[in-house]
Amino acid sequence: MYAIIMTGGKQYRVSEGDTLRVEKLPAEVGEKVVLDKVLAVGEGADLKVGNPYVEGAKVTASVQAQDKAPKIIVFKYKPKKNYRRKQGHRQPYTQLQIEKIEIQ
């Protein structure tokens, strides 16, 4: 069984036991989170699509880690004008372990 969920403005295809990184969620490590924005649920050839969400469907996950992604460098410059700006950014994320996909 798989589900397509939406969190942090992005969509993910998940199955039970999957590990995925999503945009930072306000939860502690080890805590359970319920993702109720389920766009579709499928098993084999059977697919149930929501409008926009599937009624009574929810995905339960546990928080494995709260961390930051590797640093990216943002560098702006204007040639011949001695204008240079260097900035780094590390995007925070939450790592989830999918435990259960339920549909009623």
From Swiss-Prot:
Residue ranges of coiled coil: none
GO molecular function: rRNA binding; structural constituent of ribosome
Keyword Transmembrane part of the UniProt annotation: no
Keywords assigned by UniProt, alphabetized: Ribonucleoprotein, Ribosomal protein, RNA-binding, rRNA-binding
GO CC terms in record: cytoplasm; ribonucleoprotein complex; ribosome
GO biological process: translation
Matches recorded under NCBIfam families: L21
Subunit structure: Part of the 50S ribosomal subunit. Contacts protein L20.
Protein's UniProt name: Large ribosomal subunit protein bL21
